[in-house]
Amino acid sequence: KMFDTKKEKGEESYGRGENFMYYPKEETVKFLNRFVKKKKSLEEYVQLIDSPEKLRGLDFGCGIGRMTILLHEFDIDGYGIDISQNAVIEGKKLSKHFGFNLESYLQAYDGEKIPFDDNYFDFTISEGVLDSMPFELAKKLIKDIERVTKRYFFLSLISAESADMFRQTKNEELFDGEVEVEEAHEKGTIQSLFSKSKIEEFIKDTDFKIKWCELHTVEGCVNKYQHGRWYLVLEK
């Protein structure tokens, strides 16, 4: 089955520079320190995943590759894939700015099949990606993420508390369906909001189990609004 990945809308959004993340996400740094490799001093790390070889990680939906670069800062072989060619080109430039050459580590892909072998990665990270597509496509992709991942999958998803952020669902306290974004930011892209039960539905056909999970909710004090994100570590 072919899915509408909204690739064109994603490219337009990147073309406007809307999703260019030039700084690492704090939660990803915490995940690496808690589960993968703890930074002990400027030069020292304690590896938390047993492996005779250098660790390999996949940044799924890498955008301009700032988290892929972060993996290399942790001396991990980080690979990034994204459906946006614009983003990948920018990511290769950005990696040079940080003193890395990630020409062979960042690539655009078709949005359907991850171009790596089974269990190629010790872990995968994915920040705000699997919630930017139809749920049925996300369910297909998490199976492929499971295929290429040996152990951990760290991901973040927009929560049902974020109904407030979209015109179509503004009057609903909780909403865990899908909306096509009408607002200027990310216009035309899909947002799929997650409740706990939808997360369970999302992973039920995989061997992943929830190892760690937090729901972060934010409330506006000046303009009244609420939004939330799930942060999860899944383990095989």
List PLM regions with ranges.
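Short, well-ordered alpha-helix to beta-strand connector turns
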Residues: 75, 121, 149-150
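Hydrophobic pocket-lining residues that define ligand/cofactor binding sites across diverse proteins
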Residues: 95, 133, 149
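Short catalytic micro-motifs in class I SAM-dependent methyltransferases
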Residues: 128-132
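Class I (Rossmann-like) S-adenosyl-L-methionine-dependent methyltransferase catalytic domain
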Residues: 1-57, 63-113, 137, 153-236
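A short glycine-rich, Lys/Arg-flanked "PGG" loop and its adjoining helix->strand segment in the class I
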Residues: 139-151
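A conserved beta-strand element that flanks and buttresses the S-adenosyl-L-methionine
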Residues: 125
